[in-house]
């Protein structure tokens, strides 16, 4: 049985929207949420190929690609909000049937 999603997440089969603890600037616009689309195999492979074996950089590249924002925007998040994004990603890719 899977754990229920936290209240700061809005989850669909196609994406997850993460409510940030405070608004932040993403692509030059103040935003209170970040939406990540579901990844493809190509997304996963591309993130790995551009990270030079650095797992943290691979994750940043992947999240930035899925949210259509710059890596620098992700790096500007508070650690609490980055953890919310990572949690959202984990719920998004979780297989409910397992």
Protein language model annotation of sequence segments:
Residues 2-98:
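Short, surface-exposed, charged amphipathic helix/loop patches that serve as local interaction elements
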């Amino acid at each position: 049985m899977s754990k229920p999603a936290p209240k700061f997440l809005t989850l669909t089969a196609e994406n997850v929207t993460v409510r940030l603890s405070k608004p932040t600037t993403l692509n030059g616009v103040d935003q209170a949420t970040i939406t990540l689309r579901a990844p493809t195999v190509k997304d996963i492979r591309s993130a790995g190929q551009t990270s030079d074996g650095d797992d943290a950089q691979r994750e940043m590249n992947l999240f930035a690609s899925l949210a259509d924002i710059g890596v620098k925007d992700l790096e500007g998040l508070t650690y609490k909000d980055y953890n919310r994004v990572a949690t959202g990603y984990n719920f998004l890719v979780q297989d409910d049937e397992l």
